[in-house]
Curated annotation (Swiss-Prot):
Heterodimer with PhaC. Pathway: Biopolymer metabolism; poly-(R)-3-hydroxybutanoate biosynthesis. The keyword tRNA processing does not apply. Involved in the production of polyhydroxyalkonic acids (PHAs), which are water-insoluble biopolymers used as intracellular energy reserve material when cells grow under conditions of nutrient limitation. PHAs are composed primarily of 3-hydroxybutyric acid (3HB) and 3-hydroxyvaleric acid (3HV). Required for the production of poly-beta-hydroxybutyrate (PHB) and poly(beta-hydroxybutyrate-co-beta-hydroxyvalerate) (PHBV). Belongs to the PHA/PHB synthase family. The gene is phaE. One of its GO terms (molecular function) is acyltransferase activity. This is Poly(3-hydroxyalkanoate) polymerase subunit PhaE. GO terms for biological process: poly(3-hydroxyalkanoate) biosynthetic process; poly-hydroxybutyrate biosynthetic process.
């Protein structure tokens, strides 16, 4: 029976080690992807000052510290589990989720992140404008009404309604004047 418990413990420890290693690998991959995308965004933001970049790097350093604290917490809880304490898998998940949120806050709170995000939004709006122009050009080429054509027709319709109302008002005044004289 003792051998069986020892084997169960060995299997449990091996499974826990594999789970921790897989979680750590996913964490490192996620962190690497985040840093790469963040640095790419910084490179694409030409107006960024040295001070802003420095602040952004400090934010990243704080985020890295959060990640390292999470790794330390996870190691401590894994050690507790190996010593027999009942530690749920949810606790490990929560350590990483909370740390991820905190780390992202550290980076997202920097002016470098704001500048990079602003540049990304500006680029997206520019791309949308270009796509809209291409769509309008295609519609025009195919003989369909474009947004500009529809806007022009709407403006003309409003002007016609305004003029019609003015003519009706004058006509009413003429009819009223004829009734008074007659």
């Amino acid at each position: 029976m003792s051998q069986q418990k020892g084997d169960e413990w060995t299997m449990y420890a091996a499974e826990m080690n594999e789970t921790m290693l897989a979680a750590l690998e996913r964490n490192v991959e996620a962190q690497t992807q985040f840093v790469e995308s963040w640095l790419d965004a910084l490179e694409e933001t030409p107006e960024m000052s040295t001070e802003t970049i420095s602040e952004g790097l400090n934010g990243y350093a704080r985020a890295y510290e959060v990640w390292m604290n999470a790794a330390e917490q996870q190691f401590e809880r894994a050690s507790d589990a190996f010593e027999g304490e009942d530690v749920s898998a949810n606790e490990f998940r929560d350590i990483w989720l909370n740390s991820a949120n905190e780390a992202f806050k550290e980076v997202m709170g920097t002016s470098a992140f704001a500048a990079a995000t602003g540049q990304t939004v500006e680029d997206a709006l520019e791309m949308q404008r270009e796509v809209d122009e291409a769509a309008q050009s295609t519609l025009r080429t195919l003989g369909f009404a474009t947004e500009g054509d529809i806007d022009e027709v709407a403006e003309r319709l409003v002007e016609l309604e305004r003029r019609q109302h003015a003519v009706e008002t004058k006509l009413d005044r003429l009819l009223d004047a004829m009734d008074v004289e007659g």
